[in-house]
């Protein structure tokens, strides 16, 4: 006797099940799941795979998303502890790692998370050799370097989420001070995603009007409006949120989804993401820091050569030295 499905549906062709825009997220903690829901709501993937070693948590999160399938257009959500579920991904987002504790700097996390990367990165590449890898785990700049070394992929395809979120926070706070929406406030933060990040006050503008032309002291200690406090707030944001709710999630999830959209849709938008900066601004070491990069289907296709003033360049080099002093002693 035929089944209800056989009576209802007659199959006409055997379809190839290879996904065209598969995304894998490694790590189903707060950040990984924020990335997942944002990606689903933006309809960026035809298949979403989740990977984690915490099997019960993974199963629960997967079921929870699958039960919402009516409300988004991703046809397939899969998960597993085994990385075979990630096979043939276009983008692999790595959020796995030890969580930053209250008062702990991102750099203090480093060796713990380097050890985790050693068990993750080679397996990802084995199953998705053509993927673009997006590193989100902190300290993101150093871990992007580690992931690049472990993966054997071109540096252009191993990208750190970097200062994309720092710059978003920067623009939000500028907009809040001016009473203008963040999309109309333009400003960049480069360097480390962390305490040594560099605000490019020389380029901050609204509608092409550089704020520095209105007040040359903008962003300095002698600025009467205390714009410098905005950068201090950017640096302190994660610490404050972790103190208040235990972790950050939503803004980084939205930021990562923004990067994924630029890559998958080949938008060639410019983002401040962590990439190899050796040879730029006099930096001689293999270091990953955020600079404005063009993102498209091949990952980082171009970098924007920002004209830094003397103070900004000195701060960028200081940021590089801060990372190098930690990175040079890593073992992996």
Curated annotation (Swiss-Prot):
GO terms for biological process: lactate metabolic process; pyruvate metabolic process. The active site is at 193 (proton acceptor). Possible role in sperm motility. Substrate binds at residues 106, 138, 169, 248. Homotetramer. Interacts with RABL2/RABL2A; binds preferentially to GTP-bound RABL2. This is L-lactate dehydrogenase C chain. It comes from the Eukaryota. It comes from Sus scrofa (Pig). NAD(+) binds at residues 29-57, 99, 138. The modification Phosphoserine is found at residue 301. It is an enzyme of class 1 (oxidoreductase). HAMAP family: Lactate_dehydrog. GO terms for cellular component: mitochondrion. It catalyses: (S)-lactate + NAD(+) = pyruvate + NADH + H(+). It is found in: Cytoplasm. One of its GO terms (molecular function) is L-lactate dehydrogenase activity. Its EC number is 1.1.1.27. Pathway: Fermentation; pyruvate fermentation to lactate; (S)-lactate from pyruvate: step 1/1.
């Amino acid at each position: 006797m035929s089944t209800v499905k056989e009576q209802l549906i007659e199959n006409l062709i055997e379809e190839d099940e290879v996904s065209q825009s598969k995304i894998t997220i490694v790590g189903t903690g707060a950040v990984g799941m924020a990335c997942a829901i944002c990606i689903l709501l933006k309809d960026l993937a035809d298949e979403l795979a989740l990977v984690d070693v915490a099997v019960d948590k993974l199963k629960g999160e997967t079921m929870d998303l699958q039960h919402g399938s009516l409300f988004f257009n991703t046809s397939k959500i899969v998960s597993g502890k085994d990385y075979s579920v990630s096979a043939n991904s276009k983008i692999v987002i790595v959020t796995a790692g030890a969580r930053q504790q209250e008062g702990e700097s991102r750099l203090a996390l480093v060796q713990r998370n380097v050890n985790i990367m050693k068990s993750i990165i080679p397996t990802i590449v084995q199953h998705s050799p053509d993927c673009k890898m997006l590193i989100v785990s902190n300290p993101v700049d150093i871990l992007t370097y580690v992931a690049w070394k472990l993966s054997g992929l071109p540096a252009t395809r191993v990208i750190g989420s970097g200062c994309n979120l720092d710059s978003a926070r920067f623009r939000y706070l500028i907009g809040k001070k001016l009473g203008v929406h963040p999309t109309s406030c333009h400003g960049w933060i480069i360097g480390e995603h962390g305490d040594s990040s560099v605000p490019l006050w020389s380029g901050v503008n609204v509608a092409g009007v550089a704020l520095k032309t209105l007040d040359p002291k903008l962003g300095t200690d002698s600025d009467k409006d205390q714009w410098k406090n905005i950068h201090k707030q950017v640096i302190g944001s994660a610490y404050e949120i972790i103190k208040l709710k235990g972790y950050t999630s939503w803004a980084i999830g939205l930021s990562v989804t923004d990067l994924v959209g630029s890559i998958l849709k080949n938008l060639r938008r410019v983002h401040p993401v962590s990439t190899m900066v050796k040879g730029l601004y006099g930096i001689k070491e293999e270091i990953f820091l955020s600079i404005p990069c063009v993102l498209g289907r091949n990952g980082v296709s171009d970098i924007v050569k920002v004209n830094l003033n003397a103070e900004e360049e000195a701060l960028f080099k200081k940021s590089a030295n801060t990372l190098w002093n930690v990175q040079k002693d890593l073992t992996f």
